[in-house]
């Protein structure tokens, strides 16, 4: 259940980022995971959910990747949601994540790749 919950948090977070932010997120993936570079270049916001869902390990490391991107508020929200045990059902986790993370991404500056 925890794995599914982390997956929902990651995918919800990726739904709420711009294409520029997604490009920066992708810059950290080759260092952390064994993902073909060709797949990363074709990854866009519409395919991110399906492709990243297939890569084992991404969900367990999203917090660290968001910290590298200087998205400290987002990383903190993800940790808080996990620690408070809101992972009862995927739909409740998704609705909480959307309300908290939707505002957190836009306007946060980070290091460019």
Swiss-Prot record:
Gene3D superfamilies: Death Domain, Fas (1.10.533.10). PROSITE patterns: DAPIN. It comes from the Eukaryota. Expressed in monocytic cell lines and primary macrophages but not in B or T cells. Keywords: Inflammatory response. InterPro entries: DAPIN (IPR004020), DEATH-like_dom_sf (IPR011029). GO terms for biological process: cellular response to interferon-beta; cellular response to virus; inflammatory response; negative regulation of AIM2 inflammasome complex assembly; negative regulation of protein-containing complex assembly. Induction: Up-regulated in response to IFNB1 or virus infection. Residues 1-52 form the Pyrin domain. Functions as an inhibitor of DNA virus-induced activation of AIM2-like receptors (ALR) inflammasome through interaction with AIM2. Interacts with AIM2; disrupts assembly of the ALR inflammasome complex. Interacts with IFI16. Interacts with NLRP3. This is Pyrin domain-containing protein 5. It comes from Homo sapiens.
């Amino acid at each position: 259940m925890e794995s599914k919950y982390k997956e929902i948090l990651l995918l919800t977070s990726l739904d709420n980022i711009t294409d520029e932010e997604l490009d920066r997120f992708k810059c950290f993936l080759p260092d952390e995971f064994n993902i073909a570079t060709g797949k990363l270049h074709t990854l866009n916001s519409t395919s991110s959910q399906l492709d990243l869902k297939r890569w084992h390990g991404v969900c367990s490391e999203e917090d660290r990747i968001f910290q590298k991107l200087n998205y400290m508020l987002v990383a903190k929200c993800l940790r808080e949601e996990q620690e408070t045990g809101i992972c009862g059902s995927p739909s409740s986790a998704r609705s909480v994540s959307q309300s908290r993370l939707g505002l957190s991404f836009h306007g946060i500056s980070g290091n460019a790749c």
